[in-house]
Amino acid sequence: SHIPHRPQGAHPEVYVEYEIGMGENDSVTREDALKKLNSQIMAGEGPDLMILDGMPVDSYMEKGVLLDLAAHLDGLSGEQELFPNLVDAFRRDGKIFMIPCEFQLPVVQGEEKYISQIDGLSGIAEAVEALRADNPGADLLDICSELGIMRTLTAVCAPSWKNEDGSIHSETISEFLENAKRVYDAQMDTLAESEIESYRQRNEEWRSYYNFTWEESPYFTNGLDEIGYIAGEKKLDFGTVGYAYGYAFATSLERRDDLAGSRTDFLNGQGGKVFIAETLAGISASSPYAEKALELLDVLIGKESVVGEFSVNKAGFEESLMPDPEVYESDDVPYSSISSSNGDGMVVEVDIYWMNEEQKERLRGWIASADKAYVSDSVLEDAVYEKGAAYILGEQSLEDAVSEIEKKMAIYMAE
């Protein structure tokens, strides 16, 4: 990982010990790793700086485990300045307990006449229903399961599933499931059995290699499938852009004659414009080395930080929009090319052009409008998926599904 090396280089006088709760090949479960960490934190023996992705951050904030970073972050200026709206998305009662080092944006790719309908979650359902009306029998999304549909829509919806105090907002979960069912029903209506079987096989192949299915993998929701979209394997492509080359790839499709009328747009879901927060850093409130930990944090969110996705640091982000001068000639000369073939022998070739100033401005506008952070909450999401699947498949009423989600979360919160 790049995380420990950069602080060590910036502060050679400080010894940075880097501890991983769960290695790729060890047998430690997520629950066991969290229990061990929680015990250390409560005893005041935990790490000074923590990467909090996938951890029970609501509980940590409630228990006063994390240091308030607001004064420190608000004091950053010049090349240290962060995107203010992304910082504000983490402010609670004036306090900030964690900050993402990097982020992605949720996007949708498709024909203008359909994606122009998408303004919020019901707009997504309307667009897919309109596509089905115009394309009977076609595979609209290349997603053939209720879990796949729910996972695809989660990032732009989940931030509205909880109230400020961490309690469940049942109405928005109900609205989510209702519209996820509309999307699922429209996608599956008239779809060939061969498409459904092919999707099932892909999931099983992933399970045999990785112990999780394709739709359970991080790659399922990350990035875009431009090749699949060009090849006609789907009519709408939901995904993310999280780095400059990925955005250049997405915008290059707008230049193709065979995709006239197609574009990529920022995706709105439930309540607000969402950005996907990643590599969430927080500092232990009981750390005896809080000052050093803040210096280490400054490196992680600094201009020079080697993050894989868009940096929350404004200067670092702007630098990432600059193409490699050894490769770049002009906006109108391909920056690179990709050729891909599928199992049917169909070859797709794509010229990728570096983004022009207008396209960069569009991206900056998307970022400036983002006001809600998506931070994964696997316990809540798994509850929604499990009970929501029964509703989407017609095995349970919407009211019963939401009621069971509430019960499951109440038990978890009480533990």
Stretch-by-stretch model annotation:
Residues 275, 335-413:
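C-terminal capping/gating helix-and-loop segments adjacent to ligand/active sites or protein-protein/ligand interfaces
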Residues 71-81, 158-178, 182-183, 265-271, ...:
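Short, solvent-exposed loop/beta-turn-alpha elements that line the ligand-binding surface or hinge
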Residues 133-136, 298-334:
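Periplasmic-binding protein-like
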Residues 2-15, 384:
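Short, polar/charged alpha-helical segment
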Residues 19-82, 228-236:
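Extracytoplasmic "Venus flytrap"/periplasmic binding protein-like
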Residues 183-291, 295:
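Extracytoplasmic/periplasmic substrate-binding proteins
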Residues 54-107, 258-267:
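Hinge/lid segment of periplasmic solute-binding proteins
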Residues 91-203, 285-291:
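Helix-loop-helix "hinge/cap" segment bordering the ligand-binding cleft or interdomain interface
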